[in-house]
Amino acid sequence: MGFSRYVEVGRVVLINYGPDAGKLATVIDIVDQNKCLVEGPEEITGVKRQVISYRRIALTDLTVPIQRNARAKTLKAAWKEADTLAKWEGSQWAKKLAAKKTRAGLSDFDRFKVMVAKKQKSRIIAQKMKELKE
């Protein structure tokens, strides 16, 4: 299977680092081989229109049907019509990021409780497997 995520107008991207790290944006225009113009839309994702390096973004599978250099109002309407935010939140990538964020916010006692729960789960699975083998 070939590579299918290309930098194109309407491609939804995840910003990796910088002030907008972790936010989604949409490619509005391609500036050159190293940069593109992106916008949130600001009302939905909080990303203002800006030129950003390809090194700072990760391409997602999502695209929004827009024209080159689309206005903010047009972009916002296209996002809502395509239900882009819901599609993103339903993706495995977004779920992994949310889980990572939740894990990072755990206290020491919370991590201990997770460890105990994993041990209990493992013990139950081992018992069931033993019963099935007999």
Indicate residue ranges for each PLM-predicted region.
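Short coil-to-beta-strand transition motifs
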Residues: N16-L24
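Ferredoxin-like alpha/beta domains used as RNA- or RNAP-binding modules
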Residues: G2-V9, N16, I28-E134
